[in-house]
Amino acid sequence: MAESTAGSEAEQDGMTPVRPVEAELLVVTGMSGAGRSTAADALEDHGWYVVENLPPQMLGTLAELVSHAPQSIPKLAVVVDVRSTALFADIRAALKTLEASGVTFRVLFLDANDDVLVRRFEQGRRPHPLQEGGRILDGIASERDLLHELRDSADIVLDTSEFNVHALATAITELFSETGPVALRLNVMSFGFKYGLPVDANFVVDARFIPNPHWVPQLRPHTGLDKDVSDYVLEAEGVKSFVDRYVLAIEPVLDGYRRENKHYATIAVGCTGGKHRSVAVAMELSKKLAQYPRVTVTTTHRDLGRE
């Protein structure tokens, strides 16, 4: 799918532009319970015009109307709920039509693991839309089967399993609050292997080869964000060389992502508990990657404070 670019705005004196103004179009979809409404609210807070629960067959018509308006909406987000085979066929057709007509757009797919989705539905005391009298898990399984092709083709897949409402809003802000699109957004995430691999990781770096500060009494209470721990980790034999070589190795991958219009990727750096080594290495890796042009780097620590 083509990379979205915000079009030029209408003249301030109210004159109609000579050529149509092209809006940045974002299609928001995903699993029920994964946070579409929260994402819509966050986008609206940052200047997006948001249309929720639009029937998929109306997507092309809305995009055409907006792009040809005398004073265009520069950032349009359409939240599409696909909960039946018929609606899924409609959105596939609508996206193909948009692509064929040259409309630039991106698709954001929100996902979460099954256990989290079940808990959210139970906490909200509401049934899954595809449950049909069965279990919530049955509805989730039906929806996953229905949406897997859409998920595979999405420009951005955002896993919200570890997010509360505020964390999801922050993630949406980091992705979409800037005036213009960024060629590639990297999230460097530290984590602890004992808590499981991050499901949205594109790359996994194993930092367990580094001596563990946990076994140094004066360092154990601290984290990889503290200078003493960071120095201990980064000064260990081979660590700085490893980070430098990893950055060089990943450079052609980042270039390929840009060519393929991939906008978001996660590099997960793991150690045993996600407290010392992975945190220090993630910070150093973020600093190195931030030097690359057309790359925006954010750093998160999934399991810091979990112990």
UniProtKB/Swiss-Prot annotation:
An MF annotation (GO) of this entry: ATP binding
Residue positions binding ATP: G30, M31, S32, G33, A34, G35, R36, S37
Identification of the protein by name: Nucleotide-binding protein Arth_2083
Listed PANTHER family: RNASE ADAPTER PROTEIN RAPZ
Protein family (similarity comment): Belongs to the RapZ-like family.
Residues binding GTP, per UniProt: D81, V82, R83, S84
Pfam family, one: PapZ_C
High-level lineage: Bacteria, Bacillati, Actinomycetota, Actinomycetes, Micrococcales
